[in-house]
Amino acid sequence: MTAGSAQAAPVKAVTKAGETSLQTEINRLINVERTSRGCAALKTDAKLTTAARGHSAWMAQTGTFSHTGRSNSNFVARSKAAGYAKPSAENIAWGYRTAKQVVDGWMKSPGHRTNILNCKSTTVGVGAVFSANGTPYYTQDFGY
């Protein structure tokens, strides 16, 4: 599923530590959404995070916003290439400046919301990567 973008605002260069902090906050916020609706909190999975960060980095490097990635890969292929056997869904977004904005955007979109609130999913990996011009790209990969 894809989400649109918020209005772009000028940003300073973001470090990998800043991206990691953003990813952690997105994970926290989606777990608030899930647990408030009766689903278990998702566990962060390093393999799904690798797949998600890789796809976000590719989108940021190429300026492409798509579920289809490098070499026509999809989220299943990327997750399996990272060593995760049972991927369940993917959300992407771009342009949002805060974790709250991106999670709010996903929650307002029926398809993204369904992915986040799928109680059968047990794990998640989030990749937040900023392009050279400061545009953030997000990938959220879920697994069983």
What are these regions (language model features)?
Residues 1-8:
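Secretory targeting and sorting signals
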Residues 74-144:
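A well-ordered secondary-structure block
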Residues 18-76, 120, 124, 131:
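Short, well-ordered surface patches within globular domains
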Residues 11, 27, 116:
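Alpha-helical and His/Cys-centered functional microenvironments
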Residues 4, 61-63, 80, 141:
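Short alpha-helix boundary/capping motifs
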Residues 14-15, 40, 84:
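Short amphipathic alpha-helical segments at helix-loop
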Residues 9-19:
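Cleaved targeting-peptide boundary
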